[in-house]
Amino acid sequence: MFTSRANPVANHEEAVACVTAMQAAEDQDLTRDVCITKLYDHGKQTEHVIILIHGFTNCPEQFSELGKQHFEAGSNVFIPRMPYHGLSDRLTDALVNLTAQDLTAFGDKLIDIAHGLGKKITVMGVSGSGTLVAWLAQNRSDIDFAFAIAPLFGLAFVPPAFTKFFERIVLLLPNFYMWWDPRTKANNPYSIYYAYPGYPTRALVEFLRLAMIVRAQAEKFPPKARNITMIINDSEPAVSNAEIVKFIDLWQRHENVTVSEVHFEKEMNLPHDIITPGTPGVPIAEIQPRLIGVIRDLHSKPES
């Protein structure tokens, strides 16, 4: 069910046609304008294509600023919209329809399209999409560089010893709507105007389900991506850093697997979302150059 099904496009023209079709479908789907899938394209296949996948309840605009900088540096940049995200109605319950199968099929499609946009494929995701990046890194050998920012492998308030038990329990719970901040609700200052201020718990459960799946795969076989980097916020308030470290260890138990770590220091006192420009308390002018530098340094490193 969660086996990757690669079907790469043949060329740049086909890749652009696929993205155009995605955008047209989203335009009919009441998607907020800034949340429609973005493609910053040089008109031809470039050496590198960078896929930037927005976080849970956010939308492609989250990565727009970072994406433009990668584009100006010479890469094609693909910023897709995850299923059921970015709709004009911020209080929609559409996310209740999201499944782990939707996420893996979506991820496969992105990598397939990327083949026409760049000779080498880089994919980056944050939070829930960081979990998807982990699944892609586990299953797709055609990924050259995978970056997972604060991936959701567990929740910070759940002790590591109880993570697997918690994941199995939440799969059985009925769905209900949760605010990111129950005090401010729809007026949450940390939830920017194009992101959802809350979510159906069933959608969060599907990301946890995906985490369980990729963890089970990692116990059986090594990741297929060539280079993997985990980006960890040492002051992370939402996802479990302990589970991220455990997952890195799980991967590195396999022969010839090295997972790099990049840490944003605890002294920075960052919130969970370190990507969205305009988020209170996030020094974007400091964070973006570091993220760009990490990718640039790996891209320029001679192949072994």
Language model: regions and residue ranges:
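Short, surface-exposed "cap/lid" segments of acyl-processing enzymes
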Residues: T31-H85
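Serine-hydrolase catalytic core
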Residues: Y40-K44, I192-M268, V282-R296, P302
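Glycine-rich "HGGG/HGxG" loop immediately N-terminal to the catalytic nucleophile
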Residues: Y84-N97
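Alpha/beta-hydrolase-fold catalytic nucleophile elbow
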Residues: I149-A150, I231
